[in-house]
């Protein structure tokens, strides 16, 4: 874990995401396991979050997003590369993001994961940038963007327009996680195609294979 911490700190500093800090703030470091089995360094900002005035910008309801897809036959899914890290922190707020680790005291120059207002801030930015296409040919939830169309010709044009808009705003997508010109895609935990929404097979299997619940805490955890 220490080796992984050292590597991730080095990658963040080399990439220009963090810098050494002399800030009086010093949040602790945590490690979170990702779906692919690797670990991601996160900062425990609970103390800072408790003092933060909350940004009430609403996150969209997933069921309302899916309602927009009726009649669509072509789909493109874009995943922004390290989405939060594409937003710079205001110079006056950089010191507040400082964290301590075994290998030094650092602060973020870009928006880190774990800040209470990070989702609302990112959602607001995405809505501002993609406003011309929202609910017409695009739905977006945080760093996941779905372009949907009824014809291939319209879809190709709309994909080009969205990519150009992202380029103009200096937002980068992660190519390995993008799916272009598809008849079916996975998006926000569902399989989507021209026939509608479908529960993903692995999620159904997980529910079917769940052991019998006998305690209130087990039921609460399942829900």
Q: How would you describe each model-predicted region?
A:
Residues 1-223:
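Retroelement reverse transcriptase polymerase core
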């Amino acid at each position: 874990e220490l080796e992984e911490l050292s590597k991730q700190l080095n990658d963040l500093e080399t990439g220009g995401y963090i810098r050494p800090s002399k800030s009086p703030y010093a949040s602790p470091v945590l490690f979170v396991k990702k779906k692919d089995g690797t670990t991601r360094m996160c900062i425990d900002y609970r103390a800072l979050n408790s003092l933060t005035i909350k940004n009430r910008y609403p996150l969209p309801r997933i069921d309302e997003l899916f309602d927009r897809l009726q009649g669509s036959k072509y789909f493109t899914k874009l995943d922004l590369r390290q989405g939060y890290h594409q937003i710079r922190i205001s110079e006056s707020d950089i010191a507040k993001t400082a964290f301590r680790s075994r290998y030094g005291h650092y602060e973020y120059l870009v928006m880190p994961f774990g800040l209470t207002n990070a989702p609302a801030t990112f959602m607001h930015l995405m809505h501002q940038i993609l406003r011309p296409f929202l609910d017409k040919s695009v739905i977006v939830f945080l760093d996941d963007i779905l372009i949907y169309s009824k014809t291939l010709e319209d879809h190709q044009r709309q994909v080009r327009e969205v990519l150009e808009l992202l380029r103009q705003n200096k937002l980068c997508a992660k190519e390995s996680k993008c799916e272009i010109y598809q008849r079916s895609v996975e998006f926000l935990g569902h399989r989507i195609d021209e026939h509608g929404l479908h529960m993903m097979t692995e999620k159904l299997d997980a529910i079917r294979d769940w052991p019998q619940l006998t305690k209130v805490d087990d039921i609460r955890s399942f829900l």
